[in-house]
Amino acid sequence: MNAFKLSALARLTATMGFLGGMGSAMADQQLVDQLSQLKLNVKMLDNRAGENGVDCAALGADWASCNRVLFTLSNDGQAIDGKDWVIYFHSPRQTLRVDNDQFKIAHLTGDLYKLEPTAKFSGFPAGKAVEIPVVAEYWQLFRNDFLPRWYATSGDAKPKMLANTDTENLDQFVAPFTGDQWKRTKDDKNILMTPASRFVSNADLQTLPAGALRGKIVPTPMQVKVHAQDADLRKGVALDLSTLVKPAADVVSQRFALLGVPVQTNGYPIKTDIQPGKFKGAMAVSGAYELKIGKKEAQVIGFDQAGVFYGLQSILSLVPSDGSGKIATLDASDAPRFPYRGIFLDVARNFHKKDAVLRLLDQMAAYKLNKFHFHLSDDEGWRIEIPGLPELTEVGGQRCHDLSETTCLLPQYGQGPDVYGGFFSRQDYIDIIKYAQARQIEVIPEIDMPAHARAAVVSMEARYKKLHAAGKEQEANEFRLVDPTDTSNTTSVQFFNRQSYLNPCLDSSQRFVDKVIGEIAQMHKEAGQPIKTWHFGGDEAKNIRLGAGYTDKAKPEPGKGIIDQSNEDKPWAKSQVCQTMIKEGKVADMEHLPSYFGQEVSKLVKAHGIDRMQAWQDGLKDAESSKAFATSRVGVNFWDTLYWGGFDSVNDWANKGYEVVVSNPDYVYMDFPYEVNPDERGYYWGTRFSDERKVFSFAPDNMPQNAETSVDRDGNHFNAKSDKPWPGAYGLSAQLWSETQRTDPQMEYMIFPRALSVAERSWHRAGWEQDYRAGREYKGGETHFVDTQALEKDWLRFANILGQRELAKLDKGGVAYRLPVPGARVAAGKLEANIALPGLGIEYSTDGGKQWQRYDAKAKPAVSGEVQVRSVSPDGKRYSRAEKV
């Protein structure tokens, strides 16, 4: 055969191979397109599978608790016979078993799983449904446990979402819960919130007349004397704001204009002054003010600029939502209860945009909240630009379907395969700081470490690989966060492997931390607000499979998940660098590494001129006291669940010299549901609900007292006491972890309006709050130290202020807050309805939601057949969830 013939044959072979490859790729894409049209239905079968024949312990379920779920995939198109496919999905619960031998499910990382066919797979027949029963760990008590945007892949085809899961409307693919599927145990004493049970719950609330709210300020001042006359703001206000820097003065003027009170020279005069010498004793603190509102003018005297700003916010608090323009004349003396009144926002798990952050800061300022704890990094995302380390945002700032994770992190939390994410540029972050500074808010940046660091670890590995390939070995290792000798088998709280933890024993880890602190500190300086507090993070540096809910198969204990714990390691256990440090006596053991690292980071913090470090308390648990750290002050976010012993352990931290910022999950975690109803959003490991009333009733400076006013996770009473001294809390912070909020409106729904209850409790100590007494035991349902009548009266006032006045202001601020679902019943053929925040409008429908009518409690409508109810925002633009009575 001559050369020409060989060449022609080679070209023909190559062409056929190319065409074959094209054909294969087209076939893969066709298969993915077909799979994307499968309709998913998720149905909860049994949240207490262990009581009904499933051996959860043998399956290795934490605390031997598991549930059963049914996945149904319906095929309305042509038969699908191909086996070379994967469907990816997200779940906060570990899959323990698949009860259909045609399918298998494997865990990838975090909440990402893949569903694949086995050799026994017989296809998805045309016009038929295939059922896949699954056993998963724990419980799935709220429908948001079932995440959207399942997606299919095959070969090199472009991934594609299952169409009916590409939504935030869970009704499209998650079946309603039925019966007692919402219960965690058969003895669960929580009350399922329905229109009927809400009607009972709201029975002690009524709409107060406007006169009863006259002169009421939120948050409540220390002392107020309301006078008979009114001040008229209908011609606007003439503001003397010379005591404030211009950005703060502009904020005040803009707030008046937003609420319908124009700023003009012929308006009602409001004068301001700063006289620190006028304030004595407990009043001589930042933010204190005196306010005199007369018929002809008002005067605000502040201890400092913050005091002037807050006094003006108190005037704004009085402005009615109906635009009438008249406010009560009064005298007030006021000062904050705590120096730290905070909101924590996680933008790492799911990113939230700059505009949403600014709206949050607006509302924080209006309600005198002064600390913005900004969670900028976690396993699932890195959200701030760091000059010199572009990989942090190029890789760690976005998620997509890249199994190698060289261009992005893998998808999490139901986002789908497409590129998702975002980050704050250097200028964005400076803008946010300036915006906060103008509103008397300190920005506290948090870069979480040594655990919850996967985004940083993966990003720095991408950097390492790139520079290593270029032969720049020294530069490649400069900021590397892993010890390549470490083969530890660990599982983090949210099911990541050892990549979740940066290695605290490496010099390169310290260089990385120093670099990040330095760059962020420089941004703060340029913004005019030098960092006062650096947040170290520090939480959850552990292997959950070595936790109390698991037991080793060699000596199994009842009530626990049985696993082979001999294969489990503590974080960094097999790191040769860490092993050497322990041998040299630099640290006692692996358990002490997080606290050791916190001490080392505190030296870097101090070197950057930052006087205070803060952390989640478990990250510092092995340090002897706050004096073990280089900074002169150390704060802890105390997040022990109160009914599991937090009422006592909190004292230990205060007595060791830490500034305790009360952050208890069961009261002030705003990522938990508002009520016990499967249609609400949120995680619920600490409590099944935290509504505005529960947060309002929280006593942050006397933890045991809360046993009389609340229940545990299962709705049971509990007892609480501590025999230890209690020096007092430094502050109160409400947290929004963002795993369950993929959009900005979802974020705002979870924060507001309960953040207003946080503002009330952090600024004002109520008369019904008891002084802490060592040794006093509060027994839920038995003791009655708390004046519950005073508490209920106080809540009635506050609930009416929210419903009649403050929610309308949130409307004007563009905030997508949660509207409560009404309580309702039909009695003698007439609809009776009520609401948790009196003053909000209620609507009802008798035709399946096609038409809605306003409910009038004074003329209860006659109804028959199916009736639905919902509440409506004061501006008439938004509605609560509608429910059948």
Swiss-Prot record:
Task: Return the similarity comment.
Answer: Belongs to the glycosyl hydrolase 20 family.
> Which InterPro entries does the annotation name?
Beta_hexosaminidase_sua/sub, CBM2/CBM3_carb-bd_dom_sf, CBM2_carb-bd_dom_sf, CHB/HEX_N_dom, CHB_C_dom, Glyco_hydro_20_cat, Glycoside_hydrolase_SF, Hex-like_dom2
Q: Which UniProt keywords apply?
A: Carbohydrate metabolism, Chitin degradation, Disulfide bond, Glycosidase, Hydrolase, Periplasm, Polysaccharide degradation, Signal
Report the SS bond pairs: C56-C66, C400-C408, C505-C578
> Taxonomic lineage of this organism?
Bacteria, Pseudomonadati, Pseudomonadota, Gammaproteobacteria, Enterobacterales
Q: What does this protein do?
A: Digests the beta-1,4-glycosidic bonds in N-acetylglucosamine (GlcNAc) oligomers (mainly dimers).
Q: Which gene encodes it?
A: chb
Q: What is its EC number?
A: 3.2.1.52
- Keyword Transport appears in the UniProt entry: no
What are the start and end residues of every segment in region (Disordered)?
866-885
Instruction: Name the chain's protein.
Output: Chitobiase
Biased segments, Basic and acidic residues type = 875-885
Where does this polypeptide localize? Periplasm
